[in-house]
């Protein structure tokens, strides 16, 4: 089992499938990444050389927004909404649904867990 950009990948997994498990990389970006590096479509993670793995990590760090950057950006957006007292920011603080979902019967358990 190896880790690439913080995502765990199994040795018998195809490269395109393993790369989609990284946050910020979907199926299309995984295919583009594979083509740019010249990696075959059916090659598995355990068949990659150390050099190819380093190339994958380097290309992901260079071109794509990865896990920790996405999480940091999301958190900053939520903090900004809270600081300017937007409705969505207040709902985030309360732990209530943001997008108009029903709260009388649904989302009760989420509200109970936050109140404790």
UniProtKB/Swiss-Prot annotation:
SUPFAM superfamilies in the cross-refs: S13-like H2TH domain
Subcellular location: Mitochondrion
Annotated region described as Disordered, given as residue ranges: 92-116
Alphabetically ordered keywords of this record: Mitochondrion, Ribonucleoprotein, Ribosomal protein, RNA-binding, rRNA-binding
Gene Ontology terms, MF aspect: rRNA binding; structural constituent of ribosome
GO aspect biological process, one term: translation
Superkingdom of origin organism: Eukaryota
One GO CC term on file: ribonucleoprotein complex
Quaternary context: Part of the small ribosomal subunit.
PANTHER family noted in UniProt: 30S RIBOSOMAL PROTEIN S13/40S RIBOSOMAL PROTEIN S18, SMALL RIBOSOMAL SUBUNIT PROTEIN US13M
Protein family according to the UniProt entry: Belongs to the universal ribosomal protein uS13 family.
Function: Located at the top of the head of the small subunit, it contacts several helices of the 18S rRNA.
Listed name of the protein: Small ribosomal subunit protein uS13m
